[in-house]
C-alpha cells in the first residue's frame, strides 16, 4: 500500500500537512468501523483492516522521521533505525561530547544557563538535519539522506535523554 496514493498526495517527501489531515478525516469518515456495526463479520473485518491501514499511513506521513524512512523504502532503500548510528562512527565520535555536556549538567544540578545552551545546540542540529534531509530528497540523493537520518536520530535521542534526566532531577528536588 502506497500511503501517498491512499491520501491522494503527490509522491514526494515534502507534503501538504493540511491536505494530509483533511484527506485522513475524509477517509476516517468513510471507513470508520462504527459505521459498519450492522454489516457482516467479513465486511466489518475488511473495514477494520482499512481503518488500521489509514491510521498507520497517517502516522507515518505526519511524522518527519517516519515519512523520511518510508519514502526511502518506496525508493528501494531499506532503513533500520536500530542500526543506522552504528554505521556512522565518525559522526558519533564527533558529537559524543554532547553526552559529556549532559553529564556535566547533571553534576552541576542542571545549571539553567548551561541547560538552555545545550538545548539550543541540540535543537539547532535537529532543525539543520531536517532542512538538509529535505534538500537531499529534492536532489534524490538517498544515500546522503540515510546518513543525515542517522544524525537526526542521534540528536533526537540525546534530546529525549536530556529531557528525561532533567525531569528526574526536578522530581528529586521537589
UniProtKB/Swiss-Prot annotation:
The lineage of its organism: Bacteria, Pseudomonadati, Pseudomonadota, Gammaproteobacteria, Enterobacterales. Belongs to the HscB family. Interacts with HscA and stimulates its ATPase activity. Interacts with IscU. Keywords: Chaperone. PROSITE patterns: DNAJ_2. Gene3D superfamilies: DnaJ domain (1.10.287.110), HscB, C-terminal domain (1.20.1280.20). One of its GO terms (molecular function) is protein-folding chaperone binding. Pfam families: HSCB_C. Residues 2-74 form the J domain. InterPro entries: DnaJ_domain, HscB, HscB_C_sf, HscB_oligo_C, J_dom_sf. This is Co-chaperone protein HscB.
